[in-house]
């Protein structure tokens, strides 16, 4: 079954939002359990029913997400996109797609790319909160998308430690955005609440975050492995080298294959110097 990117994104967002609501309900239930009165018993029963419903919803979204991941690349960039020297010139130079708001997204990345990359290298809650307090406009879906693209690029280069660092920050941004939606707030006004809960490691919240982070890292690895497999197939000779008179045909087909727009998928030319600087930054932050 084919799913549009909007369906994939909606599924991922709903899954995160459901996890957060589930954590909220669990915390409420734990709080009510500390009191012993008839009214509290009624509230506890209602909270338990809400918790059960959220658990069912979470399982349903997980099933949908699993179905999407089997047939689609769930919104990660394709090999073609990565083969455009994405991080040499920033991902604003990808082949343009006819989607609403594209111009605004490009303008946003042009303006904030360096700061997004800096945020992606932060590893401590306090540092991330302070940086977003300085640059609240970074709290946006454009930032989350850029971080996801960066994760995919890093894993394709087998820079696993950097990928895991950026994935952490991508999930941070995704959770903040979904928290804002569930509270009907501007994301720039509620990111402090996220960090407050994260730093306290309240029951339910931190577990939901860690679960989502592991899922993202697993999907990034799976996506990169699929891209490497496809690249290996494209590079495989169409004929064995000992076919004698067919050697000319083999060479011709090899030339055709190498001229294919996907042929260089394993010969990416990323901005090595910039990513070396990112690695140094991660070590010092």
Swiss-Prot record:
InterPro entries, A to Z: Cdc37 (IPR004918), Cdc37_Hsp90-bd (IPR013874), Cdc37_Hsp90-bd_sf (IPR038189)
Keywords in alphabetical order: Chaperone, Coiled coil, Cytoplasm
Subcellular location, principal: cytoplasm
One Pfam family here: CDC37_M
Residues forming coiled coils: 35-73
GO cellular component: cytoplasm
Subcellular location: Cytoplasm
Region Disordered, annotated ranges: 34-54
Gene3D superfamilies, per the entry: Cdc37, Hsp90 binding domain
The protein's role, per its UniProt record: Co-chaperone that binds to numerous proteins and promotes their interaction with Hsp70 and Hsp90.
Family that this chain belongs to: Belongs to the CDC37 family.
Subunit details: Forms complexes with Hsp70 and Hsp90.
Protein name: Hsp90 co-chaperone Cdc37-like 1
Lineage start: Eukaryota, Metazoa, Chordata, Craniata, Vertebrata
Gene of this entry: cdc37l1
């Amino acid at each position: 079954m084919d799913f549009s990117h909007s369906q994939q994104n909606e599924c991922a967002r709903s899954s995160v939002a459901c996890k957060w609501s589930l954590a909220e309900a669990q915390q409420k239930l734990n709080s009510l359990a500390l009191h012993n009165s008839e009214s509290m018993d009624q509230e506890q029963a209602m909270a338990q029913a809400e918790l059960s419903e959220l658990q069912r919803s979470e399982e349903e979204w997980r099933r949908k997400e699993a179905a999407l991941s089997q047939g689609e690349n769930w919104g990660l960039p394709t090999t073609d996109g990565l083969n455009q020297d994405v991080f040499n010139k920033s991902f604003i130079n990808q082949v343009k797609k006819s989607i609403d708001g594209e111009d605004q997204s490009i303008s946003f990345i042009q303006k904030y790319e360096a700061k997004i990359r800096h945020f992606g290298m932060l590893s401590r809650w306090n540092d991330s909160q302070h940086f977003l307090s300085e640059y609240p406009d970074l709290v946006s879906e454009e930032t989350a998308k850029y971080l996801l693209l960066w994760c995919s690029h890093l894993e394709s280069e087998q820079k696993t430690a950097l990928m895991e660092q950026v994935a952490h920050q991508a999930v941070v941004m995704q959770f903040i955005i979904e928290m804002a939606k569930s509270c009907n707030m501007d994301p720039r006004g509620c990111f402090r609440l996220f960090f407050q809960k994260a730093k306290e490691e309240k029951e339910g919240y931190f577990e939901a975050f860690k679960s989502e982070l592991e899922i993202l890292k697993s999907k990034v690895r799976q996506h990169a492995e699929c891209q490497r497999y496809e690249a290996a197939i494209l590079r495989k000779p169409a004929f064995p080298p000992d076919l004698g008179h067919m050697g000319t045909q083999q060479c011709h087909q090899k030339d055709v294959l190498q001229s294919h727009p996907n042929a260089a998928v394993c010969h990416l030319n990323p901005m090595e110097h910039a990513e070396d600087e990112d690695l140094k930054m991660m070590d010092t932050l």
